[in-house]
């Protein structure tokens, strides 16, 4: 009776995956929860196994692959493939609170979470005030030189860094 699960953290964050494995092993028996660390080949091998359910969070291309492999065993799947997460701010909002929450959500893990705000839809009458409050909140969190603050997140790998550079300054 009961459920057990296998967790396969991202290979892009090996230190976090190692810590997760350590913490889980300290509080739960391995027959209940196992953490499997490894690269893409590890993920592919796991998908050859017959699970009762698969929950995947990541990008759409890998999501298609997960769905295809799960279908071979008729395994139900939940795919959390991200998307665009808008923030809507109207004049009735507490702008300071909105700014604080937007900055937290966007700057947590350098915005590299599937629920990070991607864009803001703001009522024109409060746009300027919101922008000023966002700048204040960023400075509160990271100081006047955010890039030299150790709490300011880093991009997970060179490929993502280069993609962002191309978005900012296309060739």
Where are the predicted features?
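Conserved small-residue-rich beta-alpha loop and adjacent elements
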Residues: 1-28, 74, 96
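Short beta->alpha connector loops at strand-helix junctions that form conserved
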Residues: 3, 8-10, 37, 57-58, ...
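ALDH superfamily catalytic-core signature
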Residues: 28, 53, 61-170
């Amino acid at each position: 009776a009961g459920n057990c699960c296998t967790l396969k953290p991202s290979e892009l964050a090996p230190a976090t995956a190692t810590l997760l494995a350590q913490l889980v092993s300290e509080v739960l028996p391995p027959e209940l929860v196992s953490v499997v660390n490894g690269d893409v080949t590890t993920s592919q091998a796991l998908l050859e196994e017959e699970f009762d359910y698969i929950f995947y969070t990541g990008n759409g291309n890998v999501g298609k692959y997960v769905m295809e492999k799960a279908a071979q065993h008729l395994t139900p799947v939940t795919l959390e493939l991200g998307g665009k997460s808008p923030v809507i701010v109207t004049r009735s909002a507490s702008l300071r609170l909105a700014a604080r929450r937007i900055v937290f959500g966007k700057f947590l893990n350098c915005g590299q979470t599937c629920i990070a705000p991607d864009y803001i839809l703001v009522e024109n009458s409060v746009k300027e005030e919101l922008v000023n409050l966002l700048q204040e909140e960023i400075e509160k969190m990271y100081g006047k030189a955010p890039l030299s603050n150790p709490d300011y997140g880093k991009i997970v790998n060179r490929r993502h860094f280069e993609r962002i550079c191309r978005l900012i300054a296309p060739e």
